[in-house]
């Protein structure tokens, strides 16, 4: 026999033999000794203030139970070592119990004392009190509301993730398998639970399994499981299909797709500039492939916008048909979130272009600022040029001040370009030429081997290019002194084809000997300068008109058809060209209240030469336009041969929407104005219209040569794209397009030569340099020639031809002897 005794606490007290009759259980005041299945005829009993658990196990057949000698057991117990240890631990146990009692009573005593000592203390009891909850069965309305609440939460989760329904189906399927298995187990006594669960699963996934059941109740259970299995299968199939469709939709939207590209160009926003930017980037990469400087066969472009992905894909597909050297990817996302640019791999991009998508100038600058701020937390953005189109020079300075980014703001001066091109014939063609990569464009290049060379040697030494100035410390100077020496950090600004730049870069051993400069004595230089000064007309120190070197500009009457927010800039630019007594009337269907804010802005600007008036009417209406022109005709008669100019501008909202609609409106208004003027016999000095699609303008001009269509939006788009390819050119174009900086002018050649002369282009350049101008080409017989080669051959120019120069409106005093 085996006996197991478990001791809990020890305070032994031996019982009398008379008390040993209770064999199954011995009880003391608070302790008990339990004996079970005592063998060998029983055991003598004893009592102690402790707890014993004695277990016995019979190992074989023995005689009936008998008593055990309690005295022998007690003597052995008293002599054992554990007994002595327990006796020694009794005082420690007493101390432990007292300390436990103190710890239990101390917090309550402290609370009572504090509550009694502080009259305003909280008198609440820390002991928990029953909450007295109503445990009655809920009403039907409560159950109904609970179910509705559960369905509501389930639907919310389902909207967030369609996979929630899949999880619910799996839970319901497992529940039916368990319930069906338990029912089969109840009615099938001979099968284990595992087989019953498998039978329920078979009925659920295969509807034919329930036909094999034998009893009635089993058939009912199998039938119910088969019906639910069919429902589960149909819902599971539809859920999986919907989940797949949902994932494919997310992939099509591209909002959460991580772009794994490098050396790609990111374009943010969609407006009328986009097709021209894509065209310019396609042309640049085409020439890069020909010159061998391209790193890939096609340039990857990532188009980002908050418009739906389907619309973006349609645009990309339409553009891809015309452009063979760019590959357009689309991504629909927010342009104000850092996560969007991180997923677009902005830190690995070649350049980032941010286009305006709003009509209001303040919204344009605000959105641009938020997009730039979203780029700031991204690491490694210091070397990535970010080209941002803004509408205000103040925003230009603000974006430039953002640290950690290489921001290159491009001010949208479409209104100024429109005025300049309408005042100077062929100026729009010159801009397009300088922005066409297949022709002569602006280039910036450093020549380490020519450090220390004087600017005059550089200006006259390169015979295949037109040297325009220097780029030093991030600022461009079109008029450096001839004695200025080229520094190591300087870059030379010149006009030349792209292939010439590559050819010169290959000449690593290029030295000063490559530059041929005529060596003249000081006396010869003095004589040449005096001879040239006698053949040119000197500029006044301060010119009051951009269109003429005279003190005052011409007096004209202008009819402006259309309205948008940048009319103020147009009026300011017109004021730089026109003389005193000029007038402008604006005809548009925009109310006077909406124009009043612009009128206040006009009042704040110093307009010296133009008097502005407003008329409300639709420029597309024949009668309204006729009345306006007749009123201008009467003013024209009273003004003693004051020239009349009719200009048409596009609404900004049309440009941001469908550009073709803006072109239709502008072309129709201009054709209608020409028809009315012909019927009334009104002589118009200039008929010009703003247009987006230059191809449409060429078609109409072919039919009506007297009309002029100016694609100012296209010019600004090409500037943005060129800055994206070379961010250093931003300073060049900023100075050229700025009203206060150097601009491109088409001036009469009679200012630079006498009748009967045949000077070379180099000679004309020297004469222009005396007027603090940079000659870049000429117009002969209506045909422009920029960067003519060779430059030393005589030119047969007529007095009505023109010279193309870069000049400033108010510069330093022209050079004199």
Swiss-Prot record:
Membrane topology: Multi-pass membrane protein
Superkingdom of this protein's organism: Eukaryota
Keywords of this entry: Membrane, Transmembrane, Transmembrane helix
GO cellular component terms attached to this protein's record: chloroplast; chloroplast envelope; plastid; plastid membrane
Family matches, as Pfam families: Castor_Poll_mid
Domain RCK N-terminal: 262-411, 555-716
Swiss-Prot/TrEMBL GO biological process terms: monoatomic ion transport
Xref: Gene3D superfamilies: NAD(P)-binding Rossmann-like Domain (3.40.50.720)
Location of the protein in the cell: Membrane
InterPro entries the UniProt entry points to: CASTOR/POLLUX/SYM8-like, CASTOR/POLLUX/SYM8_dom, RCK_N
Transmembrane domains' residue ranges: 165-185, 220-240
PANTHER family membership: ION CHANNEL POLLUX-LIKE 1-RELATED (PTHR31563:SF13), ION CHANNEL POLLUX-RELATED (PTHR31563)
Family: Belongs to the castor/pollux (TC 1.A.1.23) family.
Protein name, UniProt field: Putative ion channel POLLUX-like 2
Origin organism lineage: Eukaryota, Viridiplantae, Streptophyta, Embryophyta, Tracheophyta
